[in-house]
Amino acid sequence: MKFATVLAFATAAGAAFASPLASSETTEAGQLSKRQSINYVQNYNGNAANFKYDQHAGTYSTRWTNPPDFVVGLGWSPGNSYRTIKFSGSYSSSSSSYSAVYGWLNNPLTEYYVVENYSYDPCSNSGAQVVGSVTSDGSNYKICKHTQYDQPSIQGTKTFGQYFSVRANKRNSGSVTLSKHFNAWKQHGFANGAANPDFNYQVFATEAFGGTGSASMSVSG
């Protein structure tokens, strides 16, 4: 997929529905923080992919055949640096799709993905720069980055960076330790190396821009 295409629907997804739910407290890295239930629904073109969800239960499903661009899923707004996202379910795609943690930073404006399963490798795009790798959660991940010039974003038409971690051992269930990816990306400019990046939303999502497929996921974090 062209990187510009990804951003076109990601922008609209940034305006997806969000409603706060109860949270409990947990300790992370010596700091008291809140561990939230799902409070954000990502739904861009979900009607083209039979998107159904139960926000309280943290589950969603989708099925598509040659769809327009869509991105759907569940997560949190705002995101954070220390969340470990757990996901479990099924994902099958003939082409042009990801199953991934997905989110944005507000400042510096940045789009990011931790790709757990896929039928398209974003790091194979000729415009992507492979900068390294990181080992986390039982697998190696290839890291690549890309700059989008004057493209749609959660802040309108902007120039911004994209970061991707793409898992070698594809999977449909497990835990994603986000701090491992963020720390690895910071070596390549993510968040300008800030200890506490300015997060916008952060979700586990299914994205497709062609082909046929289906997904059914349970998400928590």
From Swiss-Prot:
Compartment(s) where it occurs, according to its Swiss-Prot or TrEMBL record: Secreted
Signal peptide boundaries: 1-18
EC nos: 3.2.1.8
Sugar attachment sites: 117
Protein name, as recorded: Endo-1,4-beta-xylanase 11A
Similarity comment: family membership: Belongs to the glycosyl hydrolase 11 (cellulase G) family.
Pathway terms, separated by semicolons: Glycan degradation; xylan degradation
